Amino acid sequence: MNIIPRFKHTLTVAGIYLITAVPVFSQSWPEITTEAHPATRWWWLGSAVDTANLTYNLETYAQAGLGGVEITPIYGVQGNDAHEIPFLSPVWMQMLQHTRSECKRLGMETNMNAGTGWPFGGPMISLEHAATKAIFQEYAAKGGERLQVAIDVEDPKQRDIAYLNRLMAFSDKGDRIDITSKVKNNRLDWTAPSGNWRLIALFCRKTFQQVKRAAPGGEGYVMDHFSRKAVKQYFGTFEQAFRENKVPYPHSFFNDSYEVYGADWTPDLLSEFVRRRGYRLENYLPEFLNPVRTDTTARIRSDYRETLAELLQENFTRQWTEWAHRGGSITRNQAHGSPGNLIDLYATVDIP
């Protein structure tokens, strides 16, 4: 008996039933918002821009389907100096306002780098607030010896800039003494107690790093990202420019990478360290500087790195984001290369 044909008919009927029993819903594509469109970085070479060409470019971008631009001023084109506009000057702010107005007309968003080139810095950053590095120098003394020596930075380039942060004395018996107060006018006058003493001087120096690829008007020192005062000074210049020229903040501000070379200190680090970690780093400078890895040296260096990470997150990333929010803007960060937990740093801004 052949049952295959009957079986086929049964499957066919069952299939028709399933198709007709399942309701068919019409699917419509959701409304496309500005956020769904791609955006582009917009290099302003030398900020040599004018209203006519800004409008032409923005209309071209809009026709291509772009939903926003990110303005990044950078160094200019050789031979075009006469058309360059200084960053944050009244004329530059007029160009930004024109861009905002045209973007609004075209349904696009205006974003900008909160600086020129990278990393953040410029003429508003004094040497006091520039990126900082530690220098350690050592001296020796025997018990009963009176030391009357100059405590100066050996590097001649730093001699007029660097300053003494701490001078600590460590004996072979385990004694630790802060003798910073014994230094007057860069000269130490101190008589060593019994024992053999190792003196470690900690100086704060500057890296002298300049903003890379800076646009006209943006040249200057890279700021101390660990210093709340330095970061406040930096964004205060932006706040003043936007306020005085009556230009609203853009949709977002961007940080075009960290890339701060050699900056491993900040003037308040020792006081911040004891407040956060519960002990004084200066009392453990021999262990901190010891190249041999032990449980103690590893823990101290870990605490040091954790302190730097917290200062970067709180004094730079969070302060920057709070500043942007006060002006109705949001932040976007390129945190890679930062001395901190990258996930924490990205989580501190609005757009990772």
Language-model-derived ranges and their functions:
Residues G65, T348-P352:
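Glycine-enriched alpha-helix->loop->beta-strand junction motifs that scaffold or abut catalytic
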Residues T10-P23:
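Bacterial N-terminal signal peptides
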Residues M1-F7:
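N-terminal secretory signal peptides that target proteins for export/translocation
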Residues T110-G121, H251-S257, Y304-N341:
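Aromatic-lined carbohydrate-recognition surfaces of secreted/lumenal glycan-active proteins
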Residues S28-I32, H37, G46-V49, N53-T55, ...:
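Mature extracytoplasmic enzyme cores
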Residues E31, N341-Y346:
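Short glycine-biased active-site loop of nucleotidyltransferases that positions the nucleotide triphosphate
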Residues T72-I85:
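Glycine-rich, proline-tolerant flexible connector loops at the mouths of alpha/beta enzymes
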